[in-house]
């Protein structure tokens, strides 16, 4: 996964040598939030094909996110976290890295069919929920205006609305060009933001968030998925997606709403590293590739 590590290291090194400042991360995050990610969301909404199995796959993501957030809220209250720490903890404990890590893992283990399932799980499951519930948690208020005016959510809605209209090849090419920049820019911003002392300071909460995110999600998807009659590949890929560590976009929201980005980035970074160890075990447990 060199493509994952390289932009992070590049951002970290360039900050170390004074080429970039930590404060410049917000410019990059705004680029993602207001330009690149809405385009990616538009394309996802425009390409998705609705059907009963699609609804079943999406519902697995919804159930797992709600359960993770419920467990995380109880634990956060027990730890008496501050308001900003609590909201950050809820974000990193509930939403999984189902696109950035989930897509490569799904394709690697289950091929093109697995990738299609992962796209459904991510776009109509994780991304839809983080655009709605995640923004509500991050902003600290049930403000529907904030949610419905959230640029990536608007992109997803417009994509759905225009599903029956084919895109001109030139426009499609331009949109592809922009959406391919999304993940590298987020990773580079992570490199600018990452703070090793911050990881040490938040190690306990980060590990706890990862444990909640992975274990509760896997358990929820495994138990519910057995009863809703998914195809074997859809079930296995949904289980794999449920095992993804904290979502990169949770850290973006933590930055955007001035929560605790050090906790968020520590959770994301540790989660990515740990996923290389535990994901193969999840795949082996759920039956391996097709």
Which residue ranges define each predicted feature?
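Alpha-helical transmembrane segments of multi-pass small-molecule/ion transporters
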Residues: 1-290
